[in-house]
UniProtKB/Swiss-Prot annotation:
Superkingdom of the organism of origin: Eukaryota
Phylogenetic classification of the source organism: Eukaryota, Metazoa, Chordata, Craniata, Vertebrata
Chain's gene name: PRNP
Biased composition (Gly residues): 55-97
Binding site for Cu(2+) 4: 88, 90-91
Stated name of the protein: Major prion protein
Membrane topology: Lipid-anchor; GPI-anchor
Residues the entry annotates as binding Cu(2+) 2: 72-74
Length: 255
């Protein structure tokens, strides 16, 4: 009877050793550091302009042919035919102006795996397609090359965001793409929704992009470290030696 019991446990241990329990995860590749020289986003805007232009229309300083807070052509404060978060022609998402309710688009589904992985760092932002809102940071002290701009930044830094929007790092191949997406959505959200059309100048936009870029780099580093730690823990507890040890302890307790 004892030999049969021991033989069963040996069979279980043998199967556990040859089970493929390794965890295969795609890990983000490390990117470059802050201020490594030159633009890391080729094709993003004209020389001397901002590095994070929207996908269509004018630049951050003059969207849709209009100035900040100007109704002609649609400014950030008074967009043409509907505000931020509303389609052209008025109405909220799913209403589409004169469209009927049956034509309402389906709501985006948030990937709960990504939400759970980043729950400690921020909360999911409703209406932004699964973006997370990072924790508040101290605005970095940045030098812009001349005393006039440095003084302007110190006097107006409170107008710039101190939190960034981002997605889980496992959705990106490297730091550059994470930071690019993070800067775009954060600046857009801040200039359109948070400040409700505050009249930002081109200098404000340039400084805001620099500030947000550095905060996005910091956010990426935090998320990458947490991501690797979670992955290492899962791999450790799913490795064959650990399973063997746990099985042996169970054998001693049961036997």
């Amino acid at each position: 009877m004892v030999k049969s019991h021991i033989g069963s446990w040996i069979l279980v241990l043998f199967v556990a050793m040859w089970s493929d329990v390794g965890l295969c995860k795609k890990r983000p590749k490390p990117g470059g550091g802050w201020n490594t020289g030159g633009s890391r986003y080729p094709g993003q805007g004209s020389p001397g302009g901002n590095r994070y232009p929207p996908q269509g229309g004018g630049g951050w300083g003059q969207p849709h042919g209009g100035g900040w807070g100007q109704p002609h052509g649609g400014g950030w404060g008074q967009p043409h035919g509907g505000g931020w978060g509303q389609p052209h022609g008025g109405g909220g998402w799913g209403q589409g102006g004169t469209h009927s309710q049956w034509n309402k688009p389906s709501k985006p589904k948030t990937n709960m795996k990504h939400v759970a992985g980043a729950a400690a760092a921020g909360a999911v932002v409703g209406g932004l397609g699964g973006y997370l809102l990072g924790s508040a940071m101290s605005r970095p002290l940045i030098h812009f090359g001349n005393d006039c701009e440095d003084r302007y930044y110190r006097e107006n830094m409170y107008r710039y965001p101190n939190q960034v929007y981002y997605r889980s790092v496992d959705q990106y191949n490297n730091q550059s793409t994470f930071v690019h997406d993070c800067v775009n959505i954060t600046v857009k959200q801040h200039t359109v929704t948070t400040t409700k059309g505050e009249n930002f100048t081109e200098t404000d936009i340039k400084m805001m992009e620099r500030v947000v870029e550095q905060m996005c780099i910091t956010q990426y580093q935090r998320e990458s470290e947490a991501y690797y730690q979670r992955g290492a823990s899962v791999i450790l507890f799913s490795s064959p030696p650990v399973i063997l040890l746990v099985s042996f302890l169970i054998f001693l307790i049961v036997g």
